[in-house]
Amino acid sequence: MGNLFDSSKTLWGNMNHGSSRYSLNGKIMLASVIILFVAVILILCFHSYARWLFRRQNRRIRRRISAHLRSLAAARDPTQSSSSLSPLDPTVLEKIPIFVYSVKTHESPLEECSVCLSEFEEDDEGRVLPKCGHVFHVDCIDTWFRSRSSCPLCRAPVQPAQPVTEPEPVAAVFPSVKPIEDTEAGSSSSSDESESSTPSSSSGSPVRFPMEACEREPIDLVGIIVEIPREFQDSNSDLPADNGSNRRASLKRLWII
């Protein structure tokens, strides 16, 4: 009887010892699950914070580059008239499509933006240039186009070239020439003859002008004597008689005036 009681007591003790061991293992498992869950949460929080900090740094870099590009655009020489140095037309810039980057929509990873030198991340907005196909951030390329109108990488023009309009041929209009009347022809011929005879007469003999009568009497010039210097007389003494008559005619004209 005593042996039976001892055996039952031993069995009951073993069962209590096993249940306490199971409870201890359950507590350890629960604690480990809680610790693992907290660790995962901490890792996710740290990853989110690091990603936010990295994107914030990229935004600062973009703003700094944008401010630098604005200063370059403000300090640019206004006398430069090259097409690549002129700012892009806002209407052309609005026609360039904008996309939102996502890993699901873009199977192959995009290249980094050449303006800010940072890679595209989730939900980043970008533009694809139509001619060369290069991809840039919206903020970066919009700031670039405020002072340039070409691609930052290949310098391909973004703005379409304006068609050259050829000037229309202008018909030449000649004024109609009216026939010259006989009187004009006669007067022109007489004037030509007089002009042709003038140099010949001047070269051969002095020109004689006809005496012109003055109707007014020379009242104010009465008693005026014109004296000719002796040197002038000596120098003109060797001239022919025609020159003397011309001199007398000129003196008479002065006297009449």
UniProtKB/Swiss-Prot annotation:
The lineage of its organism: Eukaryota, Viridiplantae, Streptophyta, Embryophyta, Tracheophyta. The gene is ATL5. It is found in: Membrane. Residues 181-209 are annotated as: Disordered. GO terms for cellular component: membrane. It catalyses: S-ubiquitinyl-[E2 ubiquitin-conjugating enzyme]-L-cysteine + [acceptor protein]-L-lysine = [E2 ubiquitin-conjugating enzyme]-L-cysteine + N(6)-ubiquitinyl-[acceptor protein]-L-lysine. This is RING-H2 finger protein ATL5. CDD domains: RING-H2_EL5-like. SUPFAM superfamilies: RING/U-box (SSF57850).
